[in-house]
Amino acid sequence: IPQDELGYDKIYDSLDQADGITPEDATRLNVLLESLLNKIGIYYKSEEFSSDFNRALSLYAGPFTVIPENENDDFWLGFWDYFLFDYHLICNDLSPLQHFYDTNKDFVQQTELRILQDLLKAEFTVFFINYVRDDDMVECTNLFTNEHMQLPQPDYGLYDYRKVLLYGHIYLKGVVMLNYITSVPASKNLRNRIKEEVVRQQQVYRQQEKSATLDDFFKRHAVAVRHTIDILVRLAKVNVVSPNLLVR
């Protein structure tokens, strides 16, 4: 049954205009999003994209990570978030999400098309939680821009949330869209350390792209940011970028 005939498009219209959504509508939106992402996943598991898939897996996992066989493992959730939004395809340098949209926009349901358009506006964001509100929302701050955001509470609990750093793709306008969000333990000092290292990486990148902003760096090298966070969480005293590489 086409999703639009089930009234999903009207639900998405109402969500786009609403200040808040009910738990029931949130559940229906999650069903829509999961169905669409599964469809995209099947598309990219074809032989045509096997080289890209294996290349992306190597870039994401690095040389030391043991790749789990269980498809429900958090590793795979994080990988698909990276692959769809941040990886660049060999054939055209587009993100897989953008390529899927360009080649399938005439064949998907109208609601799926609108969700795709919103997902394409999502930005890789590193943030932390300031406090928990009493309406199932959390007040957050973007680590790099200091922008304040109100997001739904994570469904995995908020134990010691003041010492957690989170990152993933977020679209804040219209319907708040969050793909898989990764959380790692990080004190305030470690958060600042991570910020300093990533800004150093952006400075190195600007030797190649003179006018590159932090957003430009994230769009091109989000996997480097992911690895930097992982390295510093494990080995906080390591310099990821040598000071000798920086322009003085």
PLM region descriptions:
Residues 134-135, 145:
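Short strand-connecting beta-turns/loops that link adjacent beta-strands
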Residues 136-140:
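Short aromatic-glycine-enriched beta-strand elements
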Residues 153-169:
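Short nucleic-acid-contacting surface segments enriched for D/E, G, S/T with interspersed K/R
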Residues 141-143, 154, 181:
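Surface loops and adjacent helix of pleckstrin homology
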Residues 1-126, 131, 158, 169-248:
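Mixed-charge, low-complexity intrinsically disordered regions
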Residues 147-152:
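A short macromolecule-binding patch
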